[in-house]
């Protein structure tokens, strides 16, 4: 009889829950719930378990916020809870609450060639450090290292490092955003809201008034080539994604690869392929040659957060991770 654990991937908007086969890591019966419809994460979990008529002893939930102790307060949601209290209330033997990009990073050892697209570089070097980042509601970042055949995720809040412009155009963008925001982090330009910030800053720096656009509007107009400012914004987004990814690669010499996750880039994949992303990734002056061989991958797996939450839990339970 198959033994299942509960896994979850919770963002600022939705909570995705599923079952993970403990022996194999296979994810099944995934369902997405709107976070606006429930007063707490615990209520969502109880609803899922009731609907699927399943009892579990182990669970791992990935959440889009820092995890620094027993008390968890979500960054982009009103939900807050005690891990110990939730474990007791749900009757679980084992509950892990991890950062969302810890989960995404832990999915990487489970990915097959069919789950990724490569953007330049050569083959990854086995056992070498890995970086993963992704733009969605915010900008998530993590690294992954292999120690004694176990994968260790190094989560952090890398999306909140300073935005570091490296061109005259980016200097103008920073000047506009600094006037509005004060501190300008990388997330302020590499995220859904960040894409809008880029569009607005481009228009304002030209002495004009921007329209009130949503991220979807900027992307659609850019792809339709119906708005020069939107196309400039999307092009700049791709370039800054490349610069940021190159910075991550330098941090830990990630010859195991740099992986991109998140909900934004897959919406304009062909545009991204033709953009200045890879050139910006390698544009590190004296260290250009150092970065040329490092492969970059787009994660195309539909649920890397769930897959990684399961992988994290299974490794805690003593299993070895592989696709």
Curated annotation (Swiss-Prot):
It catalyses: D-glucose + ATP = D-glucose 6-phosphate + ADP + H(+). InterPro entries: ATPase_NBD, Bacterial_glucokinase, Glucokinase. It comes from Yersinia enterocolitica serotype O:8 / biotype 1B (strain NCTC 13174 / 8081). It is found in: Cytoplasm. Belongs to the bacterial glucokinase family. ATP binds at residues 8-13. It comes from the Bacteria. This is Glucokinase.
